[in-house]
Amino acid sequence: MPSRASTRALQICQANQVRLHLGLRAIASLPLGLFITFFQAHGPDVGLIMLAAFSGAMALGNLAFLLAKQQTMAEATSTLAYLPVLLLSLFALFQPEEAFFALFITGVALLGVLTAAFEGYRAKAVGLSTRDGRDLLISALIALALGLMFLIATLDSVSAVGFFGAYLILFGVHWGIASATPGSK
C-alpha cells in the first residue's frame, strides 16, 4: 500500500505532465493564430496550410507524449481527431486551387466536430468535477461552436480563415492559462 506522501508525489508528477502537454498545445496554436491574424492574405490556401500545420503539430505532439509514456492511450484519443484533418488538408493542397475553399471549410468543420467529440469524451472520463475535466469540457465546447459554425453559416474566404485564426488564438490562450494554473484543489 503506497504511503500518502508517495501518492501525493505521483499526483503532482501527473499534474505537471498535464500542464506540460497543455503548454505545448498552446505553443503550437498561438503562433499559427497570430500568423493568420497579422498576415495580409486570408485566402483558403493560407487557411489550409495553417490547418495542416495545426493538426500536424497536435497529432505529432500527442503521439510523442504517447511514445514517451507521458500519457495513456485513452489520453491520446484526441490524436484521432487531428489525423483525418491533417490528411484532408495535405490532400487539399494537391488539388486545383478552385477546390481549396470547400476543402478548407470541410477540414475546419471536421476539426471542430471531431475535437469536440474526443475532448468531450476525455472530459467525461476525467470527471467534470476536476479542473482537467472542466478545461477539457471548455475545449470541447469551443471546438463544437467552431465546427457547427463552419457547418451551418455561409462564410466567405476572409471570414472563414479569420475565424479559424481566432479559434487558434482562443485555444492557445485557454491552454496557456490551463497549463500555468496551479494543480487541482
Each predicted region: which residue ranges?
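Hydrophobic alpha-helical transmembrane segments in multi-pass integral membrane proteins
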Residues: 88-98, 143-160
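Structural signal for membrane-spanning alpha-helices in multi-pass inner-membrane proteins
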Residues: 33-36, 62-65, 89-93, 119, ...
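Structural signature of hydrophobic alpha-helical transmembrane segments
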Residues: 42-57, 99-113, 161-169
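Membrane-water interface at the C-terminal end of transmembrane alpha helices
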Residues: 11, 118-130, 150-154, 171-185
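Small-residue-rich segments of transmembrane alpha-helices in multi-pass membrane proteins
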Residues: 29-32, 80-90, 135-149
